[in-house]
Amino acid sequence: MLEVRNLHAKIGDKEILRGINLTIKDGETHAIMGPNGSGKSTLSAVLVGNPLYEVTAGEVWFNGKNLLDMKPEDRAHEGLFLSFQYPVEIPGVSMTNFMKAAVNEKRKYQGLPELKAGEFIKLMREKQKIVELDNKLAGRSVNEGFSGGEKKRNEIFQMAMLEPTLSILDETDSGLDVDAMRIVAEGVNKLKTPETSCIVITHYDRLLEMIRPAVFTI
């Protein structure tokens, strides 16, 4: 699914990634651990196409396609998803409209018809149950006034809605209490299939005990 070969990347004049190699197969969950400044979040940013980072060497192949040649939105449409450590608030944009636009843009990219209003609401309610997302939260602006746990739960809800083939969870467990972490972990586990893979970036063992990745990279 994902093949990273000798990847080098920098921000400004500072090189952060120095020859990263990583192979992820269908159905695998990988845990990436390491101290602050080791490049964990930089790797996720480079994979999704954050323009602040410059790739200076190496290759990244995703499902047989050159990921580095793709625009960030095309990487998402191809099946890449990033759950942020600090999800941003988007005042004035309802969760329903935000997700409907995102889902239908991906369907359009795939050559599929847009979901009608009734079809979308049905899908949304099905996915809400997976992550135990309150219907009231789904009706509000994106992450506005959400607690830390609600924001992280909302990220997993977005993951459920978009059905990515490779999900990157960048310190999703940061700041969560045990109950919120359990709900997030259960959502991730329910979304696992033999065709989908996941990268879990973390400092802690707690989330890993709940998700149980097969491969550890330090």
Where does each model-flagged region fall?
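The feature captures the beta-strand-to-loop junction immediately N-terminal to the Walker
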Residues: 33-35
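Q-loop/switch helix immediately C-terminal to the Walker
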Residues: 86, 92-108
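Walker B catalytic motif
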Residues: 171-172
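Helical segment within the ABC ATPase nucleotide-binding domain
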Residues: 181-194
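ABC ATPase C-loop
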Residues: 159-160
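Conserved hydrophobic segment flanking the Walker A/P-loop of ABC-type ATPase nucleotide-binding domains
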Residues: 24-26
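ABC ATPase NBD Q-loop/coupling interface
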Residues: 59-75, 143
